[in-house]
Design a protein with these regions (language model features):
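Beta-alpha-beta core module
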Residues: 69-76, 81, 139-184
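Short helix-loop hinge/linker segments at domain boundaries
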Residues: 1-17, 71-75, 94-95, 158, ...
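Short beta-strand-centered segments that line the small-molecule binding cleft or hinge
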Residues: 2-4, 27-30, 34, 48-83, ...
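Hydrophobic hinge/microswitch elements
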Residues: 46-58, 112-164
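A late-sequence structural motif
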Residues: 26, 166-204
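Hydrophobic/proline-rich hinge and linker segments of small-molecule sensing/allosteric domains
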Residues: 74-113, 173-183
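Short alpha-helix C-terminal cap/hinge motif
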Residues: 2-16, 20-44, 52
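Secondary-structure junction motif
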Residues: 24-26, 93, 97-130, 138, ...
Length: 205
């Protein structure tokens, strides 16, 4: 290298963490249209780990499930999900459009360790052992061992042809939000906030 040559500058990057079930594709597409010179990198992370990922600076912002620590994070609620019960297609619940928690009282209901719903009291009858992950719970439901209550996006994420789901009208709901460390509100974070809030290119912050 001669004295006149310069080291190429690193490509600017915005890292967006997202939890299972969150769907960043629409906002990523808009980002790529508006910020072609800033690479958006998606960082998949479990719901229980996303706060630590953001605290460590391994991502600039994240699509998370509420609640978050509002003393450290800023957050913008994006949407609240319908809660559903996942059942085998031949289960009696599959014959109706929606159910209540009382309808599940006599059923075994799987409660995985990574459950993202906040329960005052768990529905149904407890399984002998809690599965570690939602994916494991879905496998158990498919094997005829109980039912599973989850946000609709997770039911879709773990879709199987032999399973279906129905709305649970009185179950806790899960809200998805954009969150980031308040002390690290960068210009790129502000730009992404504008995208999720539907601002146009010419809108002010």
């Amino acid at each position: 290298m001669t004295g006149t040559e310069k080291t190429p500058a690193a490509t600017p990057e915005f890292r967006l963490a997202y939890v299972p079930g969150a769907t960043p594709a629409k906002w990523v597409r808009i980002w790529n249209e508006r910020q072609p010179d800033v690479r958006l990198t998606l960082v998949p992370v479990e719901a229980a780990e996303v706060a630590d990922v953001l605290r460590r600076g391994d991502a600039d912002a994240g699509l998370v499930r509420l609640p978050v620590d509002r003393t450290y994070f800023s957050a913008i609620s994006l949407y609240t999900e319908t809660t559903v019960v996942v059942v085998p297609k031949d289960h009696v619940v599959a014959a109706v459009e929606e159910v209540t928690l009382a309808d599940l009282a006599d059923e075994i209901v799987q409660h995985p360790l990574d459950d993202v719903l906040e329960w005052e009291s768990l529905p149904g009858q407890a399984a002998f052992e809690r599965p570690a992950r939602t994916a494991d719970a879905v496998e158990l439901v498919a094997a005829g061992v109980g039912l599973l209550v989850v946000p609709q996006s997770l039911a879709r994420l773990h879709h199987r042809r032999d399973l279906t789901y129905r709305t649970v009208t009185d179950a806790p709901e899960s809200s998805v939000a954009l969150a980031w460390p308040e002390e690290r509100t960068t210009d790129q974070v502000e730009d992404f906030i504008g995208i999720v809030r539907g601002r146009t290119v010419n809108s002010s912050r």
